[in-house]
Structure formats: structure tokens, C-alpha cells
């Protein structure tokens, strides 16, 4: 068969197949496919639609939100405790604020009989009978969750991200007039609109796109101010504080979160000063000092506008701190702000600290308060206990950081309605410890700090607390540290107690350097005779009841999340690997072995000069007589190749030259 006939024969069966495929394609295009069931979003599977962004759904409290799985909108589930506590605090603030207007709030799951104790006397029964005859419009007004209260609170969340916090306010906090959920990101505002519609709170929550500072500056006038401002930024809130203290109403509530704990805890004192106007110190009480520095910064900003703060609750939890303060206006009260701030003198050796107030307020016979400069310093140039120098920190807030009456109200509300929040048990534990803290005693010591200073065994918590109570001092725990010792005992009394404890668990004095803090502290005989017998009141109530005071790590790789970035990677994507990559990035790299060997060869070998070096070329030091001698720079390092101990030469035995080594 010829080549042309072969090609013609092979092409014959292909033509019908090609025609059949084309006919089937045209017929399929003309036919309408069967209608499959609609999906949840109302789109059928056969319809052409743009690919949707991958989203994740989160249910927290009464709110349900969706947010991109990519790290485009910031969300951290570990801060659920923060949001639960904020809802509880704003609820009690609304109860106080609206109660003055005769409006009673209704909280889901809360019984009126549990919240208000009613003792019906004869007169009250008559009043109750009169109320039955009142017109419906004259009955006491109430505010419920999810309803607009015309005289209620105007709330601003300056950095709302996904809008979760604002939506929870609308669904869980009664007595609200409006909630403005603001964010500078267009993507975040778009997501907020979606979540607001999803939860059915569009009548209360108003998503807004603007710079948080400009928005607050635009609401400086008294009629336009917000009753509650919530600031939960990524990192430091310092850029927003000046605008916040102006935009909150008189007596309004300001809620601020700080997650830049590395700065506030003393790692970068100069950075802390540039942001908050105070120097942070590295100390065991760094978390409480961070709270007091933020309160000082808030009061300092408010004083510029004849305003001042009153702290309601200040919490250090996990990797952040959270403060709730009320802001008032009053020129006379502002004058006392200087006397509420203090500098901190802290010994670098034993850790003893002293406070120096910036101002002094004293009363005159006429009943007026006179303000003057304080006198100081309260310390000598060297520590009287260990002889070391002092570091200067602050200024910081030196007044109470909690309003115990308000904290008690929040604690009672959470205790009587434990099902309201997912973290109710932790809120009860933390607030219980807060109510036990000494309000007029700033900062604290820790058990391990006291014992490690004098190199002795650590006493039990109840033993040290009992010794302080037997000596006539007050002592408490701190919510910021589980082994804290907050006491009004002066440092000399505290070290006397530790000296008495050391006598029961002696330290080998011959192993202590004469210039060490331990040697100098233990060289003094105690004037106070400590009694370590356990007292019943040494064990705090929160500890006896086994409350959840200090939570363990909630999940793996918990802590601060990456900053939200448009089109960024998911927050959990290779997060552990990135942390390993950036770990110790500021440390100097290890010296290369070859470079180290070359560096050591620049120093002469002392044993070679004495004629006792038996290593020859294997010695890590130079055997050249003309090798340069760099006095003061010669390291005292043993040669790594040395395997046997070489006895010193005759000059070394006579005391002219030290033992084996390098000059």
C-alpha cells in the first residue's frame, strides 16, 4: 500500500469521531444542567463565581465572627480573658452610670434577688403598693442587652480589627446607646460590616474607617465625647493616649491594653522613657511597675487638660497589662497629681527599694491643702545593707492601682453568674487576689529573690508570711507574681527575718566573697527575732479555696501574634520556625575555631619562657621570642591540647611568677 493510501485509510475513522465530539459538545452546551441544591451562601455549584477568600469562623461569648485565615486582620484567642474581663467591667460601670439616672440594667442569667438585697419594711411595703398604681410610663426604666438605650453609654473601640470586641459589647453589655468600631484598615472595616450583619447588631455597632487619633481628636467637645473608650493596639498605646484622655467624657471609662512588655519590664529603659515618660527597671516587681508606669503616663497626659485619673482595676496577665481608669475634670484635683508620683531607688545588689515622692501635700490649720516640693533622697549613695549602688527608675504611680469597692462589685457579679463568661473561674481567682493585695504598698519582693541574695534555702511562703505577721507587719500576695511578698515591712526588717532564717539553714561563709551582698548582709547580727511558726491568717483566702489564680500556658506557642499585614501569611504558618530563626539574633556569633587559634598565637606562652612547655608546635600559644606582648589583653585560657598537669618552674615556686598560664 502506498504512503498516500495509508494516510487516507488512517484518516477515515478519525473524521466521524471528530464530528461526534463536536456534536456532543454543542448538544451539551445547549442543554441546561440539573439544578443542584443551593449552598449555604445561596450560590449554586454550577454558577461561575470568583474564588472566595479562605475564612475561619470563631465563636466567643455570644458573638460569632468570620475572619481571613491569612494574617490580614489581627486576632488572638489567648486574650479571651481580656475581653471577658472588659465586658464584666463595662457592665458594672453601666450599672453605676445608669443607676444615677434611675435606669436599671438587666444582665442575662443574673437574678435580681441575687444582685439587689431587698428588705421590705412597713414603709417599703407602702411604697411598693403605691408603685402598683403608677402609670406604665412612670415605672422604673430598664435597659436590656441588645437594645438601644437613649441615655446609655456611647462606646468607642479605637482599633477594632475584626470587630469581635464591639460585637460582644452589643450582645453582652446592657445599657448601650451606640458602639463605634473603628479601624484604619479598609479590609478590617469590610470584615466588620460582614460580622455586624452576621450577628444582627447593625442597630448598635457602627463600623468606621479612620485614624483612631484623628477620630478621638474630633470628639474633644463635651457633648461629643465617648463614655467608654477601649484601646487594644498592637504593641504600645502611647501614640493614642493624648487623644484618648480628651475624647472620654467627664467620669468616663478608659480601657487600655499594653503588649510591649519587653519595654515596660526594663529591657529598654530609654525606649520606655520615650513612650511613657518614665524609666523602667529590671526587677522582680517589673510587672507591677509596668502597671504603675502606664498609670503615670495616663495621668500625665490628662493633667495637660486639667483632668486626672482614678484607677478602677489594673491587671497584669499573660504577656500584657490591662488598666481601667476613670477620667475626671478638676483643676484643684490636678494639683495633687505630683504627690501621687514617685521615683524608685533600687539597690543593684540586694534588690531593696525605696520610693521618693515628687511632690508633698500637707494640710494647714484652715483645712486647705498646701503643695510643696518633696525632700530627698531616701537613701545614701551606697546601700546600707550590702554596700552596692542604687539605680533610679520612674516616675511611676504611687497611689492605689485598684478601687477595691468597684473590684468587689465586679467579683460579686461574676461569682453569682458564672455561666456568663468562658473564663469566669480565672476572673474570680484574679480578682480575689486583687482584693487581698495591700492597696497602699507599691511593688513587692519575691521568695526566690530574697533567698538567692544570701545563697540560702528558700523558705515556704507561709513561713515567711507568718514571720512578718508575728513581727507586726502586714503582708499579702500580688496577682502579678505567684511567689510575691508585698509587705509594709522596711528592708532592714525583711533582711533581719532572712538572717534568722539563715541561722536555721546555715550558709558556708567561707564560700562567700567578702564584697558580695550575701557576705555583707549575713555579717550583721539580726536585731529582730523572727518566729516562723505558721499562723492561720498567713494563708490567704484565695489560696485556701483553691481558686484559679495563676493560669498555666493556655496553648502551644501562645503569646503575642504577628502584626496584621495585607495579604500576609497566616498567623500560625511556620510561627515556631520563624521564632527559632530570629532567636538570639542580637548576640555575637560564636568565634570560628581557626580565628581563635590565630588570635591565641599572637600571645607568648609563659611556660615556654620558663622552659617548661612540652607541647612544642601543638601549643596554642606562640613560642617565638619576638612575639608581641599585649599587656592587659592576654586572656587566661588553658591550652585545649594540654592533657597533663605541668608543675610550675622554680621562679613560680619562689613566687616571682604565677603558676602555669599566660601573663
Swiss-Prot record:
Record region (Disordered): 534-574, 632-663
Pfam family, one: TRM
Keywords in alphabetical order: Cytoplasm, Metal-binding, Methyltransferase, Mitochondrion, Nucleus, Phosphoprotein, RNA-binding, S-adenosyl-L-methionine, Transferase, Transit peptide, tRNA processing, tRNA-binding, Zinc, Zinc-finger
EC number: 2.1.1.216
Sites where the protein binds S-adenosyl-L-methionine: 83, 165, 183
Residues bound to Zn(2+): 347, 350, 383, 386
KW Protease (keyword) present: no
Presequence positions on this chain: 1-16
Top-level lineage group: Eukaryota
GO process annotations (BP): tRNA N2-guanine methylation
Catalytic reaction(s) noted: guanosine(26) in tRNA + 2 S-adenosyl-L-methionine = N(2)-dimethylguanosine(26) in tRNA + 2 S-adenosyl-L-homocysteine + 2 H(+)
Signal peptide residue numbers: none
InterPro entries: SAM-dependent_MTases_sf, Trm1, tRNA_met_Trm1_C, Znf_CCCH, Znf_CCCH_sf
CDD domains in alphabetical order: AdoMet_MTases (cd02440)
GO molecular function: tRNA (guanine(26)-N2)-dimethyltransferase activity; tRNA binding; zinc ion binding
Trm1 methyltransferase domain ranges (all copies): 56-498
Zinc finger (C3H1-type): 599-626
Cellular component GO terms held in the UniProt record: cytoplasm; nucleus
Family indicated by similarity: Belongs to the class I-like SAM-binding methyltransferase superfamily. Trm1 family.
Summary of the function given for this chain in its UniProt record: Dimethylates a single guanine residue at position 26 of most nuclear- and mitochondrial-encoded tRNAs using S-adenosyl-L-methionine as donor of the methyl groups. tRNA guanine(26)-dimethylation is required for redox homeostasis and ensure proper cellular proliferation and oxidative stress survival.
PANTHER family, alphabetized: N 2 ,N 2 -DIMETHYLGUANOSINE TRNA METHYLTRANSFERASE, TRNA (GUANINE(26)-N(2))-DIMETHYLTRANSFERASE
NCBIfam families reported for this sequence: TRM1 (TIGR00308)
Name of protein: tRNA (guanine(26)-N(2))-dimethyltransferase
